[in-house]
């Protein structure tokens, strides 16, 4: 799955962009605890399966 697709998924779930440090975008949710860190090394690149699963778990989508 591409970085842009993952970002679209978590934003549709209510997560919002807080800040960026280097190539890493950090998102928060108004209700769910914690943060989600999305590596953005070029939005058109595919994420590895493990990274994708980790992001979705952080967001509570998996």
Task: Report the location of each language-model feature.
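Basic nucleic-acid-binding interfaces
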Residues: 2-19, 26-62
């Amino acid at each position: 799955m591409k970085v842009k697709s993952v970002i679209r998924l978590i934003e549709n779930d209510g997560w919002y962009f807080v800040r960026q440090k280097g190539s890493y975008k950090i998102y928060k949710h108004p209700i769910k605890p914690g943060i989600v860190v999305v590596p953005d090394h070029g939005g058109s690149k595919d994420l590895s399966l493990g990274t994708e699963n980790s992001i979705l778990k952080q967001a509570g989508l998996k």
